[in-house]
Amino acid sequence: MEGLPQSGTGQTALLTGVNAARLLGHHQGPFPSPRLRPLLKASLYAWAKEEGLALLHANAYRPEYLEKATRGRRLFLSAFAQSARLAGLPLLPLDHPLALPPGFWEDPYGVGAKAAALTRRFDLVVLEYWALDLLAHRDPERLPERFRELTLFLRGFLEEGGELLLTSDHGNAEEPWHPRHTLNPVPLVYTGEAPPPPLDLTGVLPWMQRILTSKYKKSDRNT
C-alpha cells in the first residue's frame, strides 16, 4: 500500500495478521476506525485469552482520559487498548498495582524491573510504549532523553530475567530531522527461542502464536 504507515492500520495488522491498510484502501491513524473493530475482536489478546493464557495489558491510563476517549462511537484508543477491551481485559488506572505508565518514567530501570516481575505472574504482558513516537512528532530535539529512558527500561527488564519481544508498527524516531513516519523496516527483537522471524507486520501474530503455543501447551497447563 502506497503512503506512509499509520498506527491505526499498522497496529491492527500487527495484532491481527490482516493487512488493514489494504482492507481500507489507505493507511489510517492514529486510532483504528470502526471498520477495523471486527478485526480487533480476533486479535492477539482474544487468541491468548481463548488459549487460557494469563494475560495482562499493562498500560496505565488516567480515568479522565478514558472517559473522553470512550464517549462516542469513534474510540480514541489505540489498537492495543481496543483489542484489550474487546477481549474483556480492563484498562488499568495509574494507581493500579499491576499498571505501568507508558513512558516518561522517573525510574525507567525500576519500571523495567517491575515489568519483568509481572512476566512471572502472567504468561503474556503487553506494554505499548509511545513516548518515542510522541517526541518524534512534537519535540524531536528531546528524543535522546527517550532513547536513554527506553535503554534503561530494557536493562532493568532483562537484568531482572524478563523475556523480551520488542517491535513497532512504524518508524519515525530514527529520522529526527522531520516529524513524519518513515518507510524504514521496524525492529523485531526476541530474547527467547523462536522460529524464523516474519517478514512484515502481518506475520507477527502467527509467529507469536507459534512461540506461545510452544511455551504454554494446554496439556502442560492442565497438569
Question: How does the language model describe each region?
Answer:
Residues K41-K49, T151-R155, L205:
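Short amphipathic alpha-helical segments and helix-helix/interface helices
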